[in-house]
Amino acid sequence: MLANTTPNNQHENIPGNPSTSKNSDVALRTTATADTLRVLTIEQWNFWKEYGYVVIKNAVPREQAERTANFLWEFEEKDAGNKETWYTPPRAKMEMKELVGTGMVEVYNNQHLWNNRQMEKVYDAFVDIWGTKKLWVTIDRANLNFPMPSGSEYKGFIHWDYDPETKPQNVQGVLALADQDEDTGGFQCIPWLFKNYDTWKLTQPEDRNHFKPDTTGLEDKIV
């Protein structure tokens, strides 16, 4: 067991994922060649460098994704075939009130999640991004989202899980357990903001929210 080395629980009053809020002196890889990449193609690598995100298909076997999804249904005491169970209150209390109603599932260390984290293709993808085999797993929760009920005003929100001013920069991965298209799924990003962050931030007020950017005027750039 590792001792808590975060002084005075300094993450208590800020949003985001504490496991990505700080990192070591290791910086993300800056260059690569086809023969040094394990999972990414050189085209995917160039896309990653240009747009700040990349999609790795079939990162885990479909059967394993289904087992994980079935576990989440069971953990939340909901039935995929019974819509009446979908919108019942979550089982666990959400400490981060801004996440209430967003489908977050308060499970972190179940073996299904660890099986996914330790898949060779998942590991190798991060080796490609970081440029090192010495990786430390960040721990995060799962998500079980449903179609928004009629009359709901909630909209997904673009956010960072750590302050982008953190240097060296960090990186996260999101594992989709079901097929997604333009109209479904929980992940959104703004590649334009990735490419233009340093100039964009100069247009923002000094007291801007470092975790939830003002995306006014960027709506057409969300993917």
Q: What is the predicted role of each segment?
A:
Residues 180-223:
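Double-stranded beta-helix
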Residues 40, 73, 154-158, 177, ...:
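Ligand-binding pocket scaffold of soluble enzyme catalytic domains
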Residues 139-141, 176, 192:
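Short, well-ordered beta-to-alpha junction loops that form the rim of enzyme active sites
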Residues 2-50, 57-165:
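Non-heme Fe(II)-dependent double-stranded beta-helix
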Residues 163-182:
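Short, conserved beta-strand element in jelly-roll/cupin
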